[in-house]
Amino acid sequence: MFVKICGTTSEEDALLAVAMGADAIGFIFAPSPRQVSPARVGDIVKRLPSEILTVGVFRNETAQRVVQIVNGIGLKAAQLHGQESPAEARWVRERVPFVIQAFAAGHKAIRSARDYGVDAVMIDAPSPGSGQVFDWSMAETPDGCRLVLAGGLHPDNVGHAIAQVRPWGVDVVTGVESEPGHKDARKVRAFVAAAREAAVLIEERDEPVEVAPYDWDQETPQ
């Protein structure tokens, strides 16, 4: 289970999320109570372990500017949280190692999410960062995509959300804060633990899928 702690504004909170077992740390560059400057984030990511996926979150920024910031300060991923077109998302993905495309729950574009050519698709509440929970039945995994579930998640409901939706990953902002822009260590720890536990329970309940043997020697070169 991929766990992303987003809305991080300080080195202290970034290192806290890492210590608690997060896979990814998100930094918001769009106007928000949690907005941080690229220069500040550049200093923070230098101090994080190399295995952590560092993500810049953008809303309606030009594709060129997204690539410039991500690559310029050493981030590993971009999260596009605006009205980007499939062509813009693909253009960014050709130049950035990992891209997440976010959609509001119920948005018609989700049906064509695969056209964006990104690494994962996020389904969020209609008001991102509001802490509002939406109807999880609206968060079906788009065909051929990895789903990251966001929107109103917190330590007490993330397990239920994972059990119902069965996403590839989860993302949290307000649900692990003591106040906007500041993470609460106990909440971060509890959130990561609950997400991991829910994923393990799903694996234990599900029967393994039988995979037919594959003869690599018979593979036809493309």
At which residue positions do the language-model features occur?
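Conserved N-terminal beta1-alpha1 strand-loop-helix module at the mouth
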Residues: 1-222
